[in-house]
Amino acid sequence: FLDVGCMSTKPDFKILSLDEEIIRLYFFIDNMSDKFYYSIDTLNPLVAERALDSGFLIINDVSGFVDSKMIDLAIKKECGVIVMHRNPGSENIHQKADYEDVVDQVNTHLIIQTENLIEKGVNRSQIAVDPGLGFGKKMEDSKELFFNLHNLINTYPIVVGYSRKKFTDQLNMTNNEMIDHCLDSGVDLLRLHLDN
């Protein structure tokens, strides 16, 4: 299973033009293998549609599906969707929020986000959720979430991406230990970089 992103979403990322993102996508499509399943990591519904038309099966939208066109596309294509947690008060995916109880609040927000998709017409069976480690969260909040993955909502498959996140430098854990922790906590899919 490969999650393909044509644009970085690191804290200092710059929005690519639609043309540039699609050029990068087509470069990958030209080299796709039928040995893998693919998801597209994008904020742009047009990029997501091109990917789905080329054999991708899942939209991984780190903005949390705030764009109604992305929701409409998921309904039209009946594809899988990975809904990443996003604080409803944030203006962008990396704006840090203040949490009193990060686990409880992330669960609450994910319930609101997924129920919104279902109300719009996305099938419940299409949905997986991602707590958004390192996105809009202080290091302590990401660490708290990481050690409480077993307390996340279990209504949907859980996707976790800790790879290359700064908070992991403070965990004193090897990559294999982090993988074991996630799997023991009930995580269904791990998003790792190729060098992991």
Name each model-derived stretch:
Residues I40:
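Conserved SAM-binding loop
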Residues M7-K10, D130-G132:
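Short linear capping/connector segments at secondary-structure termini
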Residues N92-I93, Q113-E140:
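Active-site rim beta-loop-alpha module in soluble metabolic enzymes
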Residues F1-C6:
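N-terminal glycine-rich anion-binding loops that anchor highly charged ligand groups
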Residues R50-A51, D130:
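A generic short-segment signal for beta-strand/edge and adjacent turn/coil regions
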Residues T9-S33, Y37, P45, L52, ...:
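Active-site-adjacent loop and "lid" segments of alpha/beta metabolic enzymes
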